[in-house]
Amino acid sequence: MSGKTVIVLLSGGLDSMVCAGLAREAGARIVALTIDYNQRHRVELESAARIAAHVGAAEHIVLPLDLRRFGGSALTADIDVPKDGVGTDIPVTYVPARNLIFLSLTLGLAEARQAADIVIGVNALDYSGYPDCRPAFIQGFEKLAALATRDGDQGVRFHIHAPLQHMTKADIAAEAARLGMDAAMSWSCYDPTPEGLHCGACDSCRLRRKGFADAGLADPTRYA
């Protein structure tokens, strides 16, 4: 990736922060894309801005897309965020087709910037079971990108890099430390308190806390 323009889908979470750090380490010219989808945890947008500045992104685009108009998720509708542990079923925090929507927008930006590399922080090990985080989805989207774009029609091969896909949350926390990324810049909680703290009980908080504990690292997160 050295010297290449790379589009990093930057939510502001720990995973996307590590992806941005990896792109910086590779010497890429980073264009960060953050989607403001009117999510419950909009505080992550502030984290995304801090991370983009920290990695020296050439551009940081914040794109508004009001998915509350769709609803259907605890992150985009008046549905309680579950706090009873990480289960085996797909939870109500799943946002319908979110990564498909976000990657489609990222692909459009990549083609507009004449970039063929996209980085996304999906994870298929320590995660909430979302179907759009699985390897088959990423592989399928690469094929779609070749069929759906002018550049693809002209032989450009888009690469969807998911460097964290087979890492545990402990691996990801350790990678953040190796990269010199301050994890306190990132935001994971789905249901922040009015005081601006991580709730400590939603799936995302539980996975984050467990990751730091399993890695034997101090967790800089402020929990309620």
From Swiss-Prot:
Its cofactor is Zn(2+). InterPro entries: QueC, Rossmann-like_a/b/a_fold. Its EC number is 6.3.4.20. It is an enzyme of class 6 (ligase). One of its GO terms (molecular function) is zinc ion binding. GO terms for biological process: queuosine biosynthetic process. It catalyses: 7-carboxy-7-deazaguanine + NH4(+) + ATP = 7-cyano-7-deazaguanine + ADP + phosphate + H2O + H(+). It comes from the Bacteria. Pathway: Purine metabolism; 7-cyano-7-deazaguanine biosynthesis. Pfam families: QueC (PF06508). Keywords: ATP-binding, Ligase, Metal-binding, Nucleotide-binding, Queuosine biosynthesis, Zinc. ATP binds at residues 10-20. Binds 1 zinc ion per subunit. Zn(2+) binds at residues 189, 199, 202, 205. Belongs to the QueC family. Catalyzes the ATP-dependent conversion of 7-carboxy-7-deazaguanine (CDG) to 7-cyano-7-deazaguanine (preQ(0)). This is 7-cyano-7-deazaguanine synthase 1.
